[in-house]
Amino acid sequence: MALVQKTEHQSHISRNVHALFIRNGRVHPLHPFKMNCSVYNSELTVYSKESTIMSERATAPTTAPAATSAPVASATSAASAENLPEPNAKLTTREKKWIVYDVGNSAFVMLSTAVVPIYANSLLQSAGQSNIVSTWGYAQTIASLIIAVMMPVLGSMADVQGMKVKFFTGFFLTGVVACCAMALPLSWLIFLVVCILATVGLNGSLTFYDSMLVDITSNERMDRVSSHGFAWGYIGSTIPFIACIALIFGGPSLFGWSTVACTRASFVITALWWVAFTIPLLTSYKQVHYRATAGQTGEAIRGTFAELGSTFRAIRKNKPLWMFMIAFFFYIDAVNTVISMSTSYGTQLGIDSTHLVMALLITQFVAFPSAIAYGKLAGRFGAKTMITTAVIAYICIVLFAAFFLRSATEFWILAILVGLFQGGIQALSRSYYGKIIPKNRANEYYGFYDIFGKTASIIGTFLVATTTSLTGNASVGVLSIAILLIVALIFLLLQRDPTRK
């Protein structure tokens, strides 16, 4: 169906209505927002049927029914409609400062994929633990479960004006502090707990970071900007990673430190890199789309709990969105499981840690141009088409890992294949979702996006860990990932793409 665009006349009406009912900084009791009336939310993408309902409510008399359970008003900063660049224009300063956070946090993602599992493996072996894959998998499952429970509620709260950056900062600091704490001499159990905290901090910050995308760019540029974020994250993270690897392997001879001490120092280096590339975003970000509070902030936050159910029902009623969410649930499960379990899987197969680390480094270099290329291809063929292509490719990758991966050479091949599609499917999923949700409720919707992704991660890592434990064969656990991808492919093929006419 045709998309609804806000006209100049509608903008004029919205400004006049807003000015009429707000006096001395307070919202009048008869403000249309207090009566559950939607007044032309800026850049809100809806279907024609839904827009008709919105229009009827916007013109309803002031004797409309009573207020909703959540005393909040939809609002959009005036900056949202100003100075928007052309779709093919160069990246703006605001977009670049958003992108560099991917450079910062990806350093920890890289470290937690390549170095942390190996270090945890040494702690587990020293403590007499044998099943590395299942133990690490259960730790990742716990972290995913915590995020899945927290994010919808916190995401809804963060849609209130000024709250998004506060929640983002809180989770970012949690991740950084936990990353530094990993450098302490800890037992294997305490180390896993700290790893869980660091993972929660990372993924929590990413939920709010992803939702910032709707504030810093337009629909037409989302695929491109999101792809650049992942691309520069991949290539940028190699700088601290190479420094850490050089320290781990060269530190003992250069400085006389033990390998363990050098590994712990790499955690601190990564945390400092993460902080450095977060500062530009923290000092420049402005929340454009938000729900302005009607009364006290605490009152509005309490109202968000009542809105969670209605938001989920709205997602269910929007069939294209719901179909995509189900598909996303299954395919991102597979992608995240491959990322989090690859090093442990290689270790279980007896592949040397040097080969594991270097192969994962190759993944980063391959993913950089691939993610940018995916963004360009999405502009030509559509984001959904490219996502579907990546899902098919991942099915082939999983089959290769399960049946043919037995040596370091094959692990290198796997790393290259993953690099070709990993960044593209992640970037386009983030931007495609941002196009089909209400912008001024982005955090709330991205909270559900995150719960689908993190709940899926629980299933994926738990499935691999449990299957490996029961069969004693890690390859069987990896093979189970293909089932999830096939289910995702079916739903993608059945979904109608709302972004294309």
Question: For each predicted feature, which ranges?
Answer:
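Helix-to-loop junctions at the C-terminal end of transmembrane segments
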Residues: 150-162, 369-383
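A membrane-interface helix-boundary motif in multi-pass transporters
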Residues: 248-272, 466-485
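Structural signature of the two symmetry-related core transmembrane helices
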Residues: 166-180, 385-400
